[in-house]
Amino acid sequence: MMKPHNLFQFLAVCSLTVAVASAQAGAVDALKQFNNDADGISGSFTQTVQSKKKTQTAHGTFKILRPGLFKWEYTLPYRQTIVGDGQTVWLYDVDLAQVTKSSQDQAIGGSPAAILSNKTALESSYTLKEDGSSNGIDYVRATPKRNNAGYQYIRIGFKGGNLAAMQLKDSFGNQTSISFGGLNTNPQLSRGAFKFTPPKGVDVLSN
């Protein structure tokens, strides 16, 4: 399992790129267009984290409402919920009966994930280019312009005009891959869906 801080940043970056990327054709122009048009998205995901020592796979669902709101719920092999409500990022580990909360600005404000709340920052924060095809999936590579972003690049893949996959390679060479399913690019979401109240009896820690 990722450490909470890394998980916060990764999921926030994912929230950005999913919201930006899941429109139609897998072209850079589609990314730019959807960045201007998209406000919300929901669906399911399978996440695989590959390091030199081991591979970890997890499954769950997600929802995003721009600006700045996201919720990722892991269901297998562990139960964990990560909610960004615009001010606080909450990580609830069901099995540990523990909640960790962090300032959203501190948790993700120093990363390109901050452009969740700024639709104009896509091109200023990333260099975008077509990145070939594999297994019928067309990829766009988004390389952060900041040297200290914490990851090397994000690859966003489309199949049949729909978002199919995303890959993120960090500065240590570890790769996180996500495949998406059941996408709804026009979900009926309210800000209330991203409010989180720690359940009674759990330990609440602050970062």
Swiss-Prot record:
Keywords assigned: Chaperone, Periplasm, Protein transport, Signal, Transport
One Pfam family per UniProt: LolA
CDD domains in the cross-refs: LolA
Record-linked InterPro entries: LolA/LolB/LppX, OM_lipoprot_carrier_LolA-like, OM_lipoprot_carrier_LolA_Pbac
Keyword Protein transport found: yes
Chief subcellular location: periplasm
SUPFAM superfamilies reported for this sequence: Prokaryotic lipoproteins and lipoprotein localization factors
Localization annotation: Periplasm
Quaternary organization: Monomer.
Name used for this protein in its record: Outer-membrane lipoprotein carrier protein
Native source organism of the sequence: Neisseria gonorrhoeae (strain ATCC 700825 / FA 1090)
Upper taxonomic lineage: Bacteria, Pseudomonadati, Pseudomonadota, Betaproteobacteria, Neisseriales
